[in-house]
Amino acid sequence: MKGCTAINMNFILASKSPRRREILENLGVRFETVTADTDESSDVTDPCRLVELLSARKGEAVREKLLAEGRDLSDTVIISSDTVVAVDGEILGKPRDAADARRMLRLLSGKAHQVVSGVCLIGNGKFGVSHEVTEVLFDELDDETVEHYIRTAKPYDKAGAYAIQGLASAYISGIKGCYFNVVGLPVHRLNTLYCETFGENFL
């Protein structure tokens, strides 16, 4: 890792996720949040390629929006991310409704699955994209537990219908890899990618 840090850069988080905002705030990063509508449909079936693609789309959409508004983006880095859950060859995004959340939780029950997050950095004429994979092991969930979780946790804005930092933590017996990746923003991967792209540490 480089010895210097990005103290003179302006950061924009291209995400609506309160969890990603909270991670950056807890790290002491000063940033603003800007979002833009993006097409999240894709024929890509590999979760690693998919999250990199969607992360890049989000970042580019915000960049184009700000340039159209006449913003000066010099010394500005746009951070974007996307997360999915992969299990049994299926990619799980956010559940559409309670029935979809129920289906997802039953798929995850008693199994190991992968949480895959993409990270994209755009700024000063440079572009970097990467991904992180974390394995998560769920307990067996009976129907009563699934219904209680759906009623209590409101899982509709979460990939795979759960958040590790909430009620679902009671059902997770272990993880292998980056915890923050499961929350929604892989901090180590972000710092590594920033160093590779801009030649200095993010943190």
Question: What are these model-derived regions, one by one?
Answer:
Residues 1-2, 65:
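A generic local structural motif
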Residues 3, 7-29:
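N-terminal beta1-alpha1 ligand-phosphate binding loop
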Residues 10-12, 25, 46-203:
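Anionic-ligand binding patches
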Residues 16, 36, 124:
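Cofactor-binding loop segments of dinucleotide-utilizing enzymes, especially the Rossmann-like FAD-
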Residues 30-32, 48:
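Active-site regions of enzymes building and remodeling cell-envelope glycoconjugates
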Residues 43:
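Short Asp/Glu-rich motifs
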Residues 32-40:
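A short beta-strand-loop structural module common to alpha/beta enzyme folds
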